[in-house]
């Protein structure tokens, strides 16, 4: 499928003086390297996004001289992957900064509409077992269906004097909770929590906690969380004060397995540079920042399901936990302690 994208002089459109068609951008004339460097993805993936989102984008831009879905998607990808409206991508497709902003908004909304299709826990028993098998092969922990963690994405201070977004390191952020499988595919992405909330507080209020609390069958599987999370029958955390060799072996296996979600955060932030703070914080309201983060999560899953490597763009530094203290309360749930001890005895003794 060849895309010949007619580029419009959007500044003329903005001022109502008509429009003109500039030189066509023919995606077939550029290399995958050019597309990767400019828009972050190869041509076949861009073709797929156009087909996936074009109906939604056409609904949002029903003006006779609206920017085409093709250009909107390229503009949004350029922003997500560069973190700037002033990147070389602007020259590549010839639209103004104001038009880019509208394109990013339109594509972000279109991607969020698609979120239920690409992010979610499976109900298929065979797929659940596949998840468990893949996690088991990492370090020998059975029955794991997902790993959960939070990380902070920096945002500008809200217009209102709202301290709820100030985290323990003193900057404004959104605390994002992700759950992923062993491949880094997101099963849940809650990207709207104020930065002042601890990981434990986010988890307690999250849809994931409600989902697992309501499950009727204890054999559905476990999540793995670090010591910032509460120990539950369905949420296994490390032993905070290991005593036996089995405890140490379990903790090592837990750390190795749980690292998948941290790697996923790093890969997302590195592929989508608008989230990593290198070119400044996200300059939008908390709600719009949340939407942009969610859109990047959807793109992450779409790319993974399309065969792209989740770890291609992974950086090495740790994700930002914003100085949160480790939760010392291992004794909240005696039944959860029993379940974890049985796990350790049966598989790590």
From Swiss-Prot:
MF terms from GO for this chain are: metal ion binding; nuclease activity
EC identifiers of the protein: 3.1.-.-
Sequence ranges assigned to domain DDE Tnp4 in this UniProt record: 148-301
Q: Which Pfam families match?
A: DDE_Tnp_4
Specify the domain of life of the species encoding this protein.
Eukaryota
- Provide the cofactor list for this protein: a divalent metal cation
Choose one Gene Ontology CC annotation of this protein and give it.
nucleus
Q: Where in the cell is it found?
A: Nucleus; Cytoplasm
**Positions with a binding annotation for a divalent metal cation:** 149, 199, 226, 262
Q: Which keywords annotate this record?
A: Cytoplasm, Hydrolase, Metal-binding, Nuclease, Nucleus
> Main location per UniProt?
nucleus
Primary role: Transposase-derived protein that may have nuclease activity (Potential). Does not have transposase activity.
* Alphabetical list of PANTHER family matching this protein: NUCLEASE HARBI1-RELATED, PTHR22930
Describe the family membership recorded for this protein in Swiss-Prot or TrEMBL: Belongs to the HARBI1 family.
Name this protein carries in UniProt:
Putative nuclease HARBI1
Organism source for this protein? Danio rerio (Zebrafish)
């Amino acid at each position: 499928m060849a895309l010949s994208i007619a580029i419009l002089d959007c500044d003329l459109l903005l001022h109502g003086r008509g429009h003109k068609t500039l030189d066509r951008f023919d995606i077939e004339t550029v290399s995958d390297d050019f597309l990767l460097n400019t828009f972050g993805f190869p041509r076949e993936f861009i073709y797929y996004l156009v087909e996936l989102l074009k109906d939604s984008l056409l609904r949002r831009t029903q003006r006779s001289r609206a920017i085409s879905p093709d250009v909107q998607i390229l503009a949004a990808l350029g922003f997500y992957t560069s973190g700037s409206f002033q990147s070389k991508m602007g020259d590549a497709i010839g639209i103004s900064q104001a038009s880019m902003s509208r394109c990013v908004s339109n594509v972000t909304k279109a991607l969020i509409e698609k979120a239920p299709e690409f992010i979610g826990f499976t109900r298929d028993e065979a797929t659940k077992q596949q998840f468990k098998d893949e996690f088991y092969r990492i370090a020998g922990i059975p029955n794991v269906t997902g790993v959960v963690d939070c990380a902070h994405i920096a945002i500008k201070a809200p217009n209102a004097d709202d301290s709820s977004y100030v985290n323990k390191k003193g900057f404004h952020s959104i605390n994002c909770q992700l759950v992923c499988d062993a491949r880094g595919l997101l099963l849940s992405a809650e990207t709207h929590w104020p930065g002042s909330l601890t990981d434990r507080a986010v988890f307690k209020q999250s849809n994931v906690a409600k989902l697992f609390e309501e499950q009727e069958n204890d054999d559905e599987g476990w999540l793995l969380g670090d010591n910032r999370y509460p120990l539950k029958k369905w949420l296994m955390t490390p032993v905070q004060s290991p005593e036996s060799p089995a405890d140490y072996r379990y903790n090592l296996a837990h750390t190795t397995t749980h690292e998948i979600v941290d790697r996923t955060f790093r890969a997302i932030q590195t592929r989508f540079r608008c989230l990593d703070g290198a070119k400044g914080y996200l300059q939008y309201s908390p709600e719009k920042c949340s939407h942009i983060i969610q859109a990047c999560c959807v793109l992450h899953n779409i790319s993974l399901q399309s065969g792209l490597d989740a770890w291609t763009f992974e950086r090495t530094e740790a994700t930002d936990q914003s100085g949160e203290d480790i939760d010392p309360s291992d004794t909240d749930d005696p039944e959860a302690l029993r379940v974890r001890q049985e796990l350790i005895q049966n598989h790590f003794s």
